[in-house]
Amino acid sequence: MDTLHHRFQQFQKTIWFNIFCYLWTGIFSFLAFAPVSLTHFVWIAPFGFFWLSLKYHGKYKKLFFHGLLIGVVFYAISFHWIIHMAITFGNFPYVVAILILLFAGLLFGLKFPIFMMSFSFLSGKIGRHSVWVAGFCGLLSELIGPQLFPWYWGNLAAGNIILAQNAEITGVYGISFLVFIVSYTLFQSNPWHWKEIIHSKEKRKQYLRFITLPALLLLTFIVSGIFLFKKWENVKPVKSLNVLIVQPDAPLSFRDGREIKESIEALMARIEKLTDEGAVRLGKKPDLIVLPEAGVPFFSAHKTEITTKVRRMYWDRFDSLMFLLANRYKANVFFNEIDAGFKGAPSPRNLRYYNNNVLYDPNGDRRDSYQKKFLLMFGEYMPFDFLYELSQQTGRFEPGLTHNLIRYYTPRYYTLAEKEKSPKGRHLGWTDTETFNHEAVRSYYETTRTEVSETGKFLPLICYEVILPEFVREFRTAGNPEFIVNLTNDKWYGATTESDQHMELGRLRSIELRRWMVRSTNSGISANIDHLGRFVGNKKTGLMTAEALSETIDVIDSPPTFYTQYGNLIPWLMLFLTGIYYLNLLIGIRRGKSS
């Protein structure tokens, strides 16, 4: 053991040790993250930080440099899909796509050097409470580090369903704090010290004192997680809804050699077929049919002066198909479209586009809509106009103005015959919309109109918004939703790990709000997630597939959770109080030296 220890110490002096640290943190973080989800590796993944912080203790420029390199390696391993996205979405050459990945690692991996420099500074100046210092610095780096695709160490640990329950109180940041506390404890419990701990009574006492706080903190999170899990597992739903998710695998563009009309016709027929097949598997009529973001790309079902004359985006056959699905099953249909409007006086300069979700009620009438508020930089807009010349596929979208919930409806039937009624003996289908214009389609179903009543409200999120916990909290001003619906298009990333990571990062919203989530994606991965963060029926769709997923979801009636009301209050309070304590210690140390 001593010989091995000596060799490791010699190895630490080499540049290869630095590379070893980069790879250690990068690889074990990836293994702990989705889709591999070997969560236990999260506890040792930060060791690379600790080794380099010890090697370059007090050398802040070097710590900053090595922290950046860890960020680049982490991004290259875990977020390698950025290359695919840059090529597919931005139409960039492969070399430029690699440079974009490296730039993302440097810029959005800043939380790594922030941790290493602050940890080296505080552990050196204070000289004690090193475990708490690790947690404090980890929390600090998580809270202030800039990110484009927000992920946190707590997300990696939340693969453990018990620990994940604490997100209801502490948010993901609280779990990140635990990760650094436990990780540093394990780091200091390395085999090199076992011999002296075993043979020295004093060393055993020191070690027991050292691990007491981390052990109590971990135990607190485990006990709290078990309590919350049991509490919410026993909550009875107030009602259930039959939900049908349609995953159409719509193309990103119509450039496969076929005529555009042929491609879009095939897509719309596929949507109709998947809906019918999903309803058959469900065995009953769905209450809610959900289509994903860009399920029907480039078109709008909103007939306005702007979408019909200024920019011809409205397609009556798109509008008709959504209307037909609503009437065929007397169900709510929630789908995505492109909408447009003027910002200010009507003029070409003031024309704006919106990423819009809208609901059609069981009569096919257009109801509430939600325009995406949190737009993705480089995807839906560019921070500077000249950048549009570099990536002409990037949209010019405008953020929505409101955080609003979506109302959904239940038809009122008076007889069984009325419930099963179809006009003139048959329902219209997609092919009929070629000969029936939208007004004719509506007229055909006029005799089947029924009274509908508002049943409840759900929280609508579009794509990226679901991974932003602070943003999702802002919907609390609109009321208390019954469940969450997330419409997403991850096709830009191909068959990479991004879809699994996107799903995993969004899963915690169900726990934070204690609401079931319906996640409908264009090309995968679609799923229903319960209020405990579990996949309902253990069902998920595949990647790059066209399929439907039918499931019954529960509605939990409960007041807003602690996290919904107070957000990251506990992590920020912990950071503030610890910061004040450390500042007081540093001032005392400085005064002691000057005297």
Swiss-Prot record:
CN hydrolase domain mapped to chain residues: 241-555
A single Gene Ontology CC term: plasma membrane
Compartment(s) where it occurs, according to its Swiss-Prot or TrEMBL record: Cell inner membrane
Enzyme Commission number(s): 2.3.1.269
Active site: 293 (proton acceptor), 372, 463 (nucleophile)
Pathways involved: Protein modification; lipoprotein biosynthesis (N-acyl transfer)
Transmembrane domains' residue ranges: 30-50, 63-83, 95-115, 167-187, 210-230, 569-589
Highest taxon, organism lineage: Bacteria
Membrane topology, as annotated: Multi-pass membrane protein
InterPro entries listed in its UniProt record: Apolipo_AcylTrfase, C-N_Hydrolase, C-N_Hydrolase_sf, LNT_N
Chief place where the protein resides: membrane
GO molecular-function term, one example from the UniProt record: N-acyltransferase activity
Gene3D superfamilies: Carbon-nitrogen hydrolase
Keywords of this entry: Acyltransferase, Cell inner membrane, Cell membrane, Membrane, Transferase, Transmembrane, Transmembrane helix
Free-text function comment from the UniProt entry: Catalyzes the phospholipid dependent N-acylation of the N-terminal cysteine of apolipoprotein, the last step in lipoprotein maturation.
Family: Belongs to the CN hydrolase family. Apolipoprotein N-acyltransferase subfamily.
Official protein name in the record: Apolipoprotein N-acyltransferase 2
Highest classification ranks of the organism: Bacteria, Pseudomonadati, Spirochaetota, Spirochaetia, Leptospirales
